[in-house]
């Protein structure tokens, strides 16, 4: 599992708690790694199962190479549409051929843009959920 924009690491930690063997998080905020490791420790998860990196996967090729190109069955991004849209062009590089890109954090009025970006970047949107003005998408590689 790869969590793009991991923040506190909550999605990666949840994935590990639900059975993922390993998770990797990345965030542009250098403080996110410390927070994610602290959150993981509080949930009994060690650094042997969770890795977290600071940086921008859109501009840092070395970081992108460290994130396991072609190795992640699931890529997560719970972040604003302005970030998900450009990430949709990059997410497929990190995924296995049968990979899934789960996005959330999209506010009302931006869902069509996110769907279009996912579809333009090789994802079939197989599920779209909306609750309380927030949208989430499940994109599968075509």
Model-derived regions: residue spans:
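Core SAM-dependent methyltransferase catalytic element
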Residues: 124-126, 130-142
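A short SAM/SAH-binding and catalytic strip from SAM-dependent methyltransferases
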Residues: 73-85
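Conserved SAM/SAH cofactor-binding pocket of Class I
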Residues: 1-57
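A short acidic, Gly/Pro-enriched loop at the edge of an enzyme's catalytic core
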Residues: 62-74
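Short beta->alpha hinge that forms the Motif I/post-I loop of the SAM-binding pocket
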Residues: 27-31, 79, 106
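A short glycine-rich, Lys/Arg-flanked "PGG" loop and its adjoining helix->strand segment in the class I
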Residues: 85-100
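ADP-ribose/adenylate-binding Rossmann-like module
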Residues: 98-111
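Conserved short alpha-helix immediately C-terminal to the canonical SAM/SAH-binding motif I
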Residues: 31-35, 83, 110
């Amino acid at each position: 599992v790869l969590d793009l924009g991991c923040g506190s690491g909550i999605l990666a930690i949840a994935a590990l708690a639900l059975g993922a063997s390993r998770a990797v998080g990345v965030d542009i905020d250098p403080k996110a790694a410390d927070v994610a490791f602290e959150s993981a420790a509080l949930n009994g998860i060690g650094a042997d199962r969770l890795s977290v990196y600071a940086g921008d996967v859109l501009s840092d090729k070395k970081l992108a190479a460290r994130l396991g190109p072609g190795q992640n069955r699931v890529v997560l991004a719970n972040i604003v549409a302005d970030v998900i849209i450009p990430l949709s062009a990059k997410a497929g590089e990190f995924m296995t051929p049968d990979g899934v890109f789960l996005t959330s954090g999209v506010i009302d009025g931006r869902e069509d843009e996110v769907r279009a970006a996912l579809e333009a970047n090789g994802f079939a949107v197989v599920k779209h959920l909306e609750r309380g003005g927030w949208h989430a998408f499940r994109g599968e590689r075509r």
